[in-house]
């Protein structure tokens, strides 16, 4: 695989630097940090450490990553715009209701990275590769959980994945977030957008 990319969570000093800069520019502002799932990174803990002694900073674990975290942040921002006098407790109470409604999952096009990361045995990798099996990974309680297996081409599996997520309950069709990684075919990406519209998503 060549050189595997690595990540590291932000340190308390990183957060303190940003919080102090914002506070210097806008001393009357309250900072609300909607954090990446704390199960997957140390960032939320670092934020809480940095918030100590800074009574204008509040940090909350969104229990999501990527598009899920973004959706929680965007909906919270809309609430604040509509309710400018809301307290932090009221805002976070609303944020919790958003988190309870967000669904997030993905289907990897290639299991090689799961294998390289130690999340898949050689036998399981070989069997899944030969049978064209692709797992559905969902974010549940902040954790990555394999919930279902799809079989066939990536196009077929991607559509089955969307059907699986839509079947989970009452869906808000006003918006959907589709995230793609580098290397995904334009054909597959275009098909997912068309299929989402066919299902009624705006």
What are these language model-derived features?
Residues 37:
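A short beta-strand-to-loop transition that corresponds to the Sensor-1 phosphate-sensing loop
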Residues 1-16, 20:
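N-terminal glycine-rich anion-binding loop in soluble enzyme alpha/beta folds
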Residues 2, 20, 25, 29-30, ...:
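Mixed-charge interfacial surface used for oligomerization/domain docking
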């Amino acid at each position: 695989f060549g050189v595997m990319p690595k990540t590291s969570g932000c340190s308390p000093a990183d957060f303190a630097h940003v919080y102090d800069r914002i506070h210097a520019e806008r001393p009357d502002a309250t900072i609300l940090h909607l954090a990446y799932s704390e199960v997957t990174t140390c960032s939320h803990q670092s934020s809480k450490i940095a918030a100590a002694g800074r009574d204008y900073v509040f940090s909350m674990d969104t229990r999501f990553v990527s598009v899920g975290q973004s959706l929680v942040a965007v909906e919270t921002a809309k609430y604040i715009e509509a309710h400018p006098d809301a307290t932090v407790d009221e805002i976070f109470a609303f944020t919790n209701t958003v988190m309870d409604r967000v669904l997030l999952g993905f289907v990897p096009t290639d299991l090689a990275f799961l294998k390289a990361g130690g999340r898949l045995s050689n036998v399981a990798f070989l069997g899944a590769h030969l049978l064209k099996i692709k797992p559905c990974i969902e974010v549940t309680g902040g954790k990555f959980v394999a919930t279902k297996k799809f079989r066939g081409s990536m196009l077929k599996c991607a559509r089955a994945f969307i059907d699986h997520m839509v079947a989970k309950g009452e869906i808000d069709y006003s918006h959907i977030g589709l995230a793609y990684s580098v290397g995904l075919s334009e054909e597959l990406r275009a098909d997912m957008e068309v299929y989402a519209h066919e299902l009624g998503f705006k």
